[in-house]
Amino acid sequence: MDTAEIRSRFLNHFARRGHTIVPSASLVAQDPTLLLVNAGMVPFKPYFLGDLATPWPRATSVQKVVRTVDIENVGRTARHASFFQMCGNFSFGDYFKAEAIPFAFELLVDGFGFKPDDLWATVYLDDDEAEGIWRELLPAERIQRRGKEDNFWSMGVPGPCGPCSEIYFDRGAAYGREGGPIADEERYLEVWNLVFMQYERGEGAGYDYPILRELPARNIDTGMGLERMATILQGVDNLYEIDISRPVLDLAGQLTGRRYGADPADDVRLRVVADHSRTAAMLIADGVVPSNEGRGYVLRRLLRRAVRDARLLGAREPVMSELFGAIGTAMGPIYPELVDNAETITGVAVAEEASFAETLRTGTTIFDAAVRQVRSTGAATLGGDEAFKLHDTYGFPIDLTLEMAAEAGLSVDEAGFRRLMERQRQTAKADRAARRIGNVDLSAFRPILARSGATTFTGYEELSRESGVVGLVGIADGAGLTVVGEGDEVGVVLDATPFYAESGGQEPDFGLLRFDGGEVEVLDVQRPVPELVLHRVKVRSGELRLGDRVQAEVDENRRRAVSRSHTATHLVHAAFRRALGEGATQAGSLNSPGRLRFDFHALGAVPPSVLTDVEDEINEVALRDLPVRAFVTTQEEARRLGAMALFGEKYGDAVRVVDVGDYARELCGGTHVASSAQLGAVKLLSESSISAGTRRVEGLVGIDAFRYLAREHLLVSQLSTALKARPDELADRVTDIVGRLRDAERELDRLRAAAVLAGAGALAEGAEDVGGVAVVTAEVPAGTSPDDVRLLAMDVRGRLAGRPAVVAVVKADGSSIVVVTDSGARSAGLRAGELVRNSWASLGGKGGGKPDIAQGGGGNSEMIPAVFAKLRGLVAELASR
């Protein structure tokens, strides 16, 4: 049974049982706690949690999935792959265990032909209900109980979870010992996991996590790996050898000069090349590009592992382009984006392959030298400093170094590597302020500090003061200067300054330094070392000399706008802690003129109603005109007073506390308004996730908030006029319009499809007889959708029932072609995929597919006559054999 048939039987089985078939979502997870979709249920997570109303009570899908947590096992076992397709059926508070278990059993036995005697089931330790249901289907001795590690499912991050029941297939004594799944999971192969989604879990490593609550409804989430099922039903040893994977595996062998099956070690690498290249193609098709972080790093790692193994197998030329072509042929019929965007997808992979080839060439030389050095001393461990150099200088990911070292029989000092990485991060953090100023060597400030002492900050009390210039520093080289002139950009250190240096999430002050005969503009203010304030300035006029006296003037409007934002952030922090609990602590912030960004710890999205309540409370506090007071005290006293200290921040013995009346109290070194009424208004604009367990709120303060509200009011007025509705009727009116538009679009789609099919009868009647095969070739308008092109081709084929038939339909601009064949034509050796490759692809296009249907893209209108002629010739040649 081919993979397409397995897929079809699965979906149809559940469609007949009231499930809506839902297309696969993108691999790029919309869930902010995930980089990539790593389970079939991920697109349904909001429905399981009750965050969104469920469009259907039951659903079924075949979802694209990427998992790289076990990447080292890919190619080494029969069941590990980084990309797979997860068949699933889902119930959202509709049915539960009593239906889910028989649904699965019926499909396995009646749909896929499994013998009941070959099936085993496992249930969670205390799940008597599930075991009782299974006992109606299997004997008790083939039902086993297992613990949390095996039979309690979660995605590995906060979210839905629950006990599960797994179904196993006994492959026979040749594959291992008796005793069921508990004894041997190589012999007893898991084919289906039925998750009884009842709970929501919290943060925690491994299996040590809290259960937060029961979900609003008891749900079902099942997962049956399509490739694993194909492995069993096609009678092959592993999922790399099934119908959609074997062509890529064989091509990897051809490109590297190694025959699959000849050498076990080579086979592992060939499987890695085939697996990783397929996963990479699917990721790129969904918009992921290689990078050094996030999902881009996952892609880069996969591509680089594939390239390295291909080269170790003997490939001397790039391989990704050809591999991606084979992947498009194998997977394109199900995922047409692989064909439609083949050029872009392949281009990304080829560029990354070329880049890594140079990295690999240089880095491998350095690695080999390091290995020789270790062996010459009789040691067995590669130093952390060598691993760090490979990573930092040559772009070698640590996992690649670990893998290569293991192959060389060495271990790696990972702890030493991590220490050096942490030191680099700390150095980067400490030096960030200086880098903002320029490439200034921190040693440039030592003589200034020794000569003049620390900079005195007076900006809490004043916005203008006379100060002395105690340091001039070149931005480009950090050199000490004595005089600068018009147009120069330099760093200026004053003995005392009212300018606030960026820190604590507050942006720096801007302003002017005036002196006899000229002035300079202050563009940025940083603390490159704790004791000194460095002003990055541009000389507008005159010459500024070391030792000059200047009038330092802070831009008052900017300072007040930033101060409003900072005070508002304190209120936002306090309001969220009141609304969500003491755990909603600040994780970061940015206070700029009229705008704030506040990051805080929270397990899930903040409901809109809570955001509204928080905003209302903040504005009520502002209207109370509470005094804002700052004072310095000891850490111990500040704690006694209940002042909030920010996680991750370090404080000295003396700390500055900022109070907003009796509402908020925090340790803070920033600038603030004098009273809460000076905020004017606060408008929260958005709430989103920035990482697992961290949310972000952005908002406007003061005149910026008023302007936003005025624009919103004007927009509502304009919409009310345009839609002839009161403001409180707008939502219903827009919903109605959108609904009618959707209905009109559906009707338009129906009419368009009908128009396309209107000519199907005439095309069938005009079929040419080529060697006893009915051949139809047709052009349709360039604007015809790919779905309608396929629909027309299959409709014409249906009208030719009883005669061997080949139907080819191409868009007039040559952008795509679909070829279909019936069983009679296929019996005569006419396979759609080969016809596309030998006609369309041979003349400059790209494409391929299955024996019954294939498609191509990347052509042009000029090649259509030649394609049709070649197609007829191929039919004549093959039909005459």
UniProtKB/Swiss-Prot annotation:
Keywords attached to this entry: Aminoacyl-tRNA synthetase, ATP-binding, Cytoplasm, Ligase, Metal-binding, Nucleotide-binding, Protein biosynthesis, RNA-binding, tRNA-binding, Zinc
Species name: Frankia alni (strain DSM 45986 / CECT 9034 / ACN14a)
Gene3D superfamilies to which the protein is assigned, alphabetical: 2.40.30.130, 3.10.310.40, 3.30.54.20, 6.10.250.550, Bira Bifunctional Protein, Domain 2 (3.30.930.10), Threonyl-trna Synthetase, Chain A, domain 2 (3.30.980.10)
InterPro entries: aa-tRNA-synth_II/BPL/LPL (IPR045864), Ala-tRNA-lgiase_IIc (IPR002318), Ala-tRNA-ligase_IIc_anticod-bd (IPR018162), Ala-tRNA-synth_IIc_core (IPR018165), Ala-tRNA-synth_IIc_N (IPR018164), Ala-tRNA_ligase (IPR050058), Ala_tRNA_ligase_euk/bac (IPR023033), DHHA1_dom (IPR003156)
GO molecular function terms listed in the Swiss-Prot or TrEMBL record: alanine-tRNA ligase activity; aminoacyl-tRNA deacylase activity; ATP binding; tRNA binding; zinc ion binding
Pfam families per the UniProt record, alphabetical: DHHA1, tRNA-synt_2c, tRNA_SAD
Location of the protein in the cell: Cytoplasm
Comment, domains: Consists of three domains; the N-terminal catalytic domain, the editing domain and the C-terminal C-Ala domain. The editing domain removes incorrectly charged amino acids, while the C-Ala domain, along with tRNA(Ala), serves as a bridge to cooperatively bring together the editing and aminoacylation centers thus stimulating deacylation of misacylated tRNAs.
Protein name: Alanine--tRNA ligase
